A protein has these predicted regions:
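Single conserved hydrophobic/aromatic residue that forms the stacking wall/gate
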Residues: 1-7, 11, 385-395
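N-terminal Rossmann-like FAD-binding beta1-loop-alpha1 element of flavoenzymes
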Residues: 21-45
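Short beta-strand to alpha-helix junction loop
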Residues: 109-131, 276
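Predominantly flavin-linked oxidoreductase catalytic cores and closely associated redox partners
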Residues: 132-295
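FAD/FMN-dependent oxidoreductases across multiple families
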Residues: 270-272, 276-367, 372-373
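Active-site-proximal substrate-binding core of FAD-dependent oxidoreductases
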Residues: 366-387, 395
Length: 395
């Protein structure tokens, strides 16, 4: 019944065809980009290929870089009213077994009315961001369509310059027999993750690589209950650099109650270089750490794996590329900008992507002016956004 109501609302929202801003992807970056541009007076169309709520594979930490945006958009109170874990510190573990606990600057955040950090399942956090984002979009005359598969990014060649003009797609998925819908806009914002169709078209039109495995990280996540030394309402998250996982790390992030997000991340190119004796899937490496590693086996002795939580994904890092014209890669062009993972902005040290997704989302609203860009987001404007994003987020 919920899905039926959502689809009826989507059909109503599909009656408009031209917008100031189209946002492809309704994760935190896309929801924030849609909200910030709507608050600027833009008529926004927010497109999401799934029906919410949906799972998202991640470490589940929401750090200090994100919290001012979470508060500004009215999501902080929503987080506080639902189960969550307050992060006050990070434990770093080395290969030789030594550990150091780094306390987060609690007082600095409290002055701003914030906690130092949160951890909660992305299904929960992303849903709240999307709910608030779509409220702001609709309050400002825009539309939101879920279960919408974008199968074409439309572009034209104007005086030798390619310009993105909008999208084509269908409600119900790529293979749906529903009518094709066409939407146009002055700017299209790509927020569809590491394989975002907008970011792919941007790089393809400029004959540049979209993917570089030296800057892509493979990630694997499970949820476990009752891991020794973790749980409660607040405390540390843990990041361990152990021999069997290098060059990467093993993490333990409590999310609520006694539930812990347990995962492993490693550069894809480095994972491929591992000796045959160690070249296993991330899932198998994590299984060995949990069941055999002398430091972690005892901590999982009385814990339970949450069935169905075993999932993998990829993270595009914002680390500098060799010989690239733009860093970390081209993330905008006439008629389009990308944010978050779609712009390859994941922090290469921590693997955290939400903060840079929200920062880049707000930046799009500063660079797009619906009055100035009535004929479309210009090539000059896209270069300014690209430069500002690199200077602010990839230093």
């Amino acid at each position: 019944d919920t899905v039926r109501r959502q689809r009826q609302m989507c059909i109503r929202d599909s009656s408009n065809t031209h917008f100031d801003v189209i946002v492809v992807g309704g994760g935190p970056g896309g929801s924030a980009a849609a909200a910030y541009n709507a608050l600027n007076g833009c008529k926004v169309l927010l497109l999401e290929k799934e029906i919410w709520p949906r799972d998202k594979i991640c470490g589940d930490a929401v750090g200090g870089k994100s919290l001012s945006h979470v508060k500004e958009l009215g999501v902080l109170d929503m987080i506080e009213s639902t189960p969550h874990y307050v992060v006050d510190s990070i434990v770093f573990g080395s290969a030789n077994g030594s550990e150091v606990r780094v306390m987060l600057p609690k007082e600095s955040y409290e002055k701003m009315g914030l906690q130092s950090g949160y951890a909660l399942p992305r299904m929960q956090f992303d849903y709240m961001m999307f709910q608030r984002g779509q409220e702001i979009v609709r309050e400002n005359g825009g539309s939101v369509i879920q279960d919408f598969s974008v199968h074409e990014i439309m572009f034209e060649n104007e005086n030798g310059v390619h310009k993105i003009k909008g999208v084509k797609g269908r409600i119900g998925g790529r293979k749906s027999d529903n009518d094709e819908l066409v939407f146009t806009s002055a700017v299209t914002i790509g927020a569809g993750g590491y394989n975002c169709p907008v970011s792919r078209v941007i790089t393809e039109l400029h004959n540049e690589p979209h993917r570089d495995d030296d800057h892509f990280c493979g990630g694997y996540r499970e949820y476990w209950d009752n891991v020794e030394g973790l749980g409660g309402e607040s405390g540390a998250i843990e990041i361990h650099f152990i021999d069997e996982v290098l060059p990467g790390y093993f993490w333990l992030f409590p999310v609520q109650g006694n539930r812990v997000n347990v995962g492993i991340g490693m550069l894809i190119s480095e994972h491929r270089k591992l000796k045959k004796s160690r070249k296993k899937s991330l899932k198998k490496i994590q299984k060995w750490v949990i069941e055999e590693h002398p430091r972690f086996k005892p901590r999982f002795a009385n814990s339970t794996l949450v069935s169905g939580s075993e999932k993998g994904w990829q993270l595009p890092f914002g680390s500098p590329r060799k010989n690239a014209e733009f860093q970390p890669r081209r993330v905008a062009m006439a008629g389009a900008m990308c944010v978050g993972d779609a712009a390859s902005l994941v922090d290469p040290f921590s693997g955290e992507g939400i903060g840079n997704a929200l920062l880049s989302a707000k930046m799009t609203s500063k660079h797009f002016d619906k009055t100035q860009h009535t004929d479309g987001f210009t090539d000059e404007a896209c270069l300014l956004y690209t430069s500002d994003a690199a200077d602010e987020l990839c230093r």
